[in-house]
């Protein structure tokens, strides 16, 4: 997203490299390993991805995914391309791979055909330690012999009090072993997996990605209508199943328990970015963003805390339990712009710029002090800072 503004070749190389390790069934792993890179957890030997008949032979990957922003990123590169012909050639090559990625999600992760896909691990949400997952993960009462051996690397570089607890990592590791023991066969995983969640952020970004893939299809002379229809189906399903009228926000749904997860987090306002709510619901969401525990209109707070600051598990510096994340602010900013909430979007834009210039490119920031925490050279923070700094909004070519 950042390279697109000044290094088109680098931007296309980054995306292409990831898709070079796409699985045969369309799964796009969240990690492609460099075997020359030093110690990392979870590393190559932890995943046992090779047990899947769909995993690539020529590279080593993880066995889980991340939110499907890739079609959106490809369109982002095209809209900022200095060499438009090269950009069209690039997304011509990527178009079938993007299609296979989305088809995998709807085929394997939406078995009832609702239009909503599920995630099967907290890591797949991108919000590993969110309090959304607490009630789901607490159902996993593990015996010592059920916990795979592992050694955390994160707490050697970041304060332990800012990171997930060891008990959470035990459950993260157990789920990976659960997948590997079933050879990453989605049907077998689905039969007994204790973590199957229809996540708001993931589905909102998938809906937006299908909208953007439809735009790419049109630019390539392909029929965009099936993609547009699928995006509308996802938006409709989110509005029917995930909307919380009382609180003016969308909620994740726990498939194993058959109920919504009543935890209020800023990422669950991201449906604005995909134009999922109607104008009335969008107004409710903006009110939630301004007046509830997210405090967009509160000048004493650095917006937007990732979790309701009045919530039971709020902690201003602990991973996804309160800190401000630039990527969530960026998504909310763009969503607010889509609905014409320019003043609120401007506050988020100014926050992104001031956090990065005053503190640096940190992984996340304390909403009560504005201080940076986590990694101090975090790539998506830098990338989105560049996007915000270099232009206020994308062109629509």
Predicted features by range, described:
Residues 1, 6, 61-72, 93-97, ...:
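Aromatic- and histidine-enriched alpha-helix N-cap/loop-to-helix transition segments
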Residues 1-9, 69-86, 204-222, 270-280, ...:
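Well-ordered alpha-helical scaffold segments within catalytic/enzyme domains
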Residues 5-13, 29, 57-66, 79-92:
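Alpha-helix boundary/capping segments in eukaryotic regulatory proteins
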Residues 7-20, 84-105, 209, 220-238, ...:
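Extended, well-ordered alpha-helical scaffold segments
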Residues 15-60, 115-200, 236-324, 357-397:
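Extended glycan-interaction surfaces of carbohydrate-active proteins
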Residues 66-137:
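Internal, well-ordered domain-core segments that constitute the primary functional module
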Residues 110-114, 215-225, 242-248:
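Surface-exposed helix-capping loop/turn segments at secondary-structure junctions
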Residues 327-331, 344-351, 356, 360, ...:
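Short amphipathic alpha-helical segments
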């Amino acid at each position: 997203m950042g390279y697109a503004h000044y290094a088109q070749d680098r931007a296309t190389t980054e995306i292409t490299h990831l898709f070079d390790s796409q699985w045969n069934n369309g799964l796009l792993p969240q990690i492609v390993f460099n075997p020359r890179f030093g110690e990392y957890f979870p590393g190559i030997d932890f995943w046992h991805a090779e047990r899947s008949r769909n995993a690539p032979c020529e590279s080593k990957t993880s066995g889980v995914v991340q939110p499907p922003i890739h079609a959106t990123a490809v369109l982002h590169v095209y809209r900022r391309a200095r060499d438009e012909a090269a950009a069209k050639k690039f997304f011509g090559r990527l178009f079938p791979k993007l299609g296979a990625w989305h088809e995998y999600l709807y085929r394997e992760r939406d078995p009832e055909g609702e239009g909503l896909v599920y995630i099967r691990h907290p890591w797949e949400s991108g919000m590993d330690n969110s309090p959304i997952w607490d009630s789901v993960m607490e159902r996993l009462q593990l015996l010592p012999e059920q916990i795979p051996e592992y050694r955390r690397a994160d707490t050697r570089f970041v304060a332990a009090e800012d990171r997930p607890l060891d008990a959470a990592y035990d459950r993260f590791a157990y789920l990976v072993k659960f997948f590997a023991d079933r050879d990453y066969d989605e049907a077998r995983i689905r039969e007994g997996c204790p973590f199957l969640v229809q996540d708001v952020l993931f589905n909102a970004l998938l809906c937006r990605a299908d909208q953007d893939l439809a735009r790419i299809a049109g630019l390539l002379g392909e029929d965009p209508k099936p993609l547009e229809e699928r995006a509308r189906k996802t938006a409709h399903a989110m509005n029917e199943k995930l909307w919380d009228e009382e609180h003016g926000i969308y909620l994740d749904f726990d498939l194993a328990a058959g109920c919504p997860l009543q935890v209020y987090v800023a990422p669950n306002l991201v449906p604005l970015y995909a134009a999922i709510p109607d104008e009335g619901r969008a107004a409710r969401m903006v009110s939630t963003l301004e007046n509830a525990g997210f405090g967009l209109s509160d000048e004493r707070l650095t917006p937007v805390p990732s979790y309701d600051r009045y919530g039971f598990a709020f902690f201003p510096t602990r991973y996804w339990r309160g800190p401000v994340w630039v990527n969530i602010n960026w998504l909310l900013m763009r969503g607010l712009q889509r609905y014409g909430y320019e003043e609120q979007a401007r506050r988020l834009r100014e926050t992104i710029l001031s956090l990065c210039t005053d503190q640096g490119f940190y992984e996340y920031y304390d909403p009560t002090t504005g201080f940076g925490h986590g990694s101090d050279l975090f790539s998506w923070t830098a990338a989105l800072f560049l996007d915000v700094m270099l232009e206020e909004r994308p062109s629509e070519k």
